[in-house]
């Protein structure tokens, strides 16, 4: 028996004309706005059943009540949030045509430039810095009239897998406050998981959207490289960095993806011709189901723990019973991908972070000379993980090691791309567990760097190849959510949404299992 996701049944009925034009039947009982998906909130705002300001206040209340425990946000500006919400309500009164997500609040990762709001990339070297302009994606959500709630916590400059390397605070997992929310963008996914925000923006270099989604039981999408503008996004590794949506369900992610995607001449790798019908793909996937879809998979037993491996196997059997066509595929260079990624990423990061000299922006630690000021500022204000990766990256690019390390990693990158090309000649999408383990205990891996880096084992291959990939909830193990990763060919992001929506229908909503007796830690 398929457990249908309620919101997709609701949307299906709406599309069949069985509901009023407002899209939803009258509510019965208490309305909890902060627990509703973004697409439903948007419909309620458009139909004027609730105001955008009421929706904003609901999430503001949640942030004020819970963020002292979760630590998802680095900065909030609720006056701005309320001002945008009021503007939406006024425009609705005048029958102004608004975007599908108008009035729906959003949180933004601190890697993304926001004019008039601090942007620090989770680092003390940018403490208090307020950018003079918005990133392209911020301009687009502003035009869509989406109120920004604030900036979310992250590992410093995106370097980490647990948000423990933030210079300001450690984000905690809403499922169990003793565990990580993932990284680097743990703040965005934790905010969505804790109902502090219905939507969030993240950035994904080697898995920084997908890994937090896995840890927090949310949806996180890495778009095709070049499909969402990087202009105004603080660079970690320029050949990998992508902005993407974080949400509680596939449809919401698709709607947000449509807002932020599209060509931008300010980004040198921006793709001109794109198919942006992601929400339509989600609708069609939910209606059509998984039958006939060719699902590739790789046996994860040599890199995943046994419980995730078993759950992945059961999930594949469930999908096969619903008509999916399974293919176990060969991925010869899978085991080398994470190593190649870290070599290239650290090399690019050492170059990108050389611009933080304290002269142009950020606070200064004064010394007797200009060079001394630069050296002192970088020594004091960069965190230990950032320093470690800058040193490694500089070493990788140095004479005598460039060919052995950097060029060898680039050769592996090419081989990974070829592996994917062969895989997608046989299947429509590739499925993998998103990570080797459920969310680990805070402090467990912070001094075990190799173990921390291995958290990215399954997410780095898609990053190397520039492919679209998303993590959706696969189930719960010992009270903790785990994710299923869907990877599609380049510029076929719609397959992530259609397949994800179909699988989401079969797996059902895992959030009813939150705060169960299996959860041994304090919960939010």
Curated annotation (Swiss-Prot):
One of its GO terms (biological process) is translation. It is an enzyme of class 6 (ligase). It catalyses: L-glutamyl-tRNA(Gln) + L-glutamine + ATP + H2O = L-glutaminyl-tRNA(Gln) + L-glutamate + ADP + phosphate + H(+). The active site is at residues 109, 184, 208. Keywords: ATP-binding, Ligase, Nucleotide-binding, Protein biosynthesis. One of its GO terms (molecular function) is glutaminyl-tRNA synthase (glutamine-hydrolyzing) activity. PROSITE patterns: AMIDASES. Its EC number is 6.3.5.7. GO terms for cellular component: glutamyl-tRNA(Gln) amidotransferase complex. NCBIfam families: gatA. Heterotrimer of A, B and C subunits. Belongs to the amidase family. GatA subfamily. HAMAP family: GatA (MF_00120). Allows the formation of correctly charged Gln-tRNA(Gln) through the transamidation of misacylated Glu-tRNA(Gln) in organisms which lack glutaminyl-tRNA synthetase. The reaction takes place in the presence of glutamine and ATP through an activated gamma-phospho-Glu-tRNA(Gln). This is Glutamyl-tRNA(Gln) amidotransferase subunit A. It comes from Tropheryma whipplei (strain Twist) (Whipple's bacillus). The lineage of its organism: Bacteria, Bacillati, Actinomycetota, Actinomycetes, Micrococcales.
């Amino acid at each position: 028996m398929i457990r249908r996701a309620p919101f997709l049944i609701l949307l299906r009925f709406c599309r069949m004309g069985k509901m009023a034009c407002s899209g939803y039947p009258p509510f019965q009982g208490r309305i909890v706005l902060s627990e509703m998906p973004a697409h439903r909130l948007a419909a309620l705002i458009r139909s004027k059943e609730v105001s955008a300001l009421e929706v904003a206040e609901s999430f503001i209340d949640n942030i004020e009540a819970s963020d002292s425990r979760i630590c998802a946000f680095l900065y909030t500006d609720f006056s701005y949030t309320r001002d945008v919400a009021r503007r939406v309500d006024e425009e609705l009164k005048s029958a102004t045509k608004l975007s599908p997500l108008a009035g729906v609040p959003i949180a933004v990762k601190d890697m993304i430039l926001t004019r008039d709001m601090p942007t620090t990339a989770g680092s003390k070297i940018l403490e208090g810095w307020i950018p003079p302009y918005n990133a392209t994606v911020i301009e687009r959500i502003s035009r869509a009239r989406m109120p920004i709630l604030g900036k979310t916590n992250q590992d410093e400059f995106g370097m980490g897998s647990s948000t423990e390397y933030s210079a300001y605070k450690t984000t905690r997992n809403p499922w169990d406050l003793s565990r990580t929310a993932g990284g680097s963008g743990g703040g965005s996914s934790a905010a969505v998981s804790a109902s502090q925000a219905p939507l969030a923006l993240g950035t994904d270099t080697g898995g920084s959207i997908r890994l937090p989604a896995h840890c927090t039981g949310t949806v996180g999408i890495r778009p095709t490289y070049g499909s969402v503008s990087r202009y105004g996004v603080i660079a970690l590794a320029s050949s990998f960095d992508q902005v993407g949506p974080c949400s509680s369900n596939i449809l919401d992610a698709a709607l947000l993806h449509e807002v932020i995607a599209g060509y931008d001449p300010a980004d040198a790798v921006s793709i001109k011709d794109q198919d942006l019908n992601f929400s339509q793909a989600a609708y069609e996937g939910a209606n059509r189901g998984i039958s006939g879809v060719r699902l590739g998979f790789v046996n994860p037993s040599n890199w995943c723990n046994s419980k995730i491996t078993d759950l992945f196997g059961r999930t594949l059997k469930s999908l096969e019973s619903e008509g999916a066509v399974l293919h176990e595929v060969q991925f010869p260079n899978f085991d080398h991908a994470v190593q190649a990624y870290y070599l290239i990423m650290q090399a690019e990061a050492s170059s990108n972070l050389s611009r933080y000299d304290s002269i142009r922006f950020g606070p200064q630690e004064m010394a007797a000379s200009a060079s001394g000021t630069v050296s002192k500022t970088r020594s004091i204000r960069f965190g230990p993980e950032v320093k470690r990766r800058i040193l490694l990256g500089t070493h990788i690019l140095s004479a005598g090691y460039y060919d052995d390390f950097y060029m060898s990693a680039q050769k592996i990158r090419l081989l990974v791309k070829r592996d994917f090309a062969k895989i997608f000649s046989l299947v429509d999408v590739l499925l993998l567990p998103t990570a080797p383990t459920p969310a680990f205990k805070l402090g467990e891996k912070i001094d075990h760097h190799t173990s921390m880096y291995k958290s990215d084992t399954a997410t780095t291959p898609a990053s190397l190849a520039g492919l679209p990939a998303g993590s959706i909830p696969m189930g719960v193990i010992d009270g903790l959510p785990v994710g299923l990763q869907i990877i599609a060919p380049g510029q076929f992001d719609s397959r992530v949404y259609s397949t994800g929506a179909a699988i989401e229908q079969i797996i059902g909503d895992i959030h009813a299992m939150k705060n169960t007796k299996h959860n041994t830690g304090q919960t939010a």
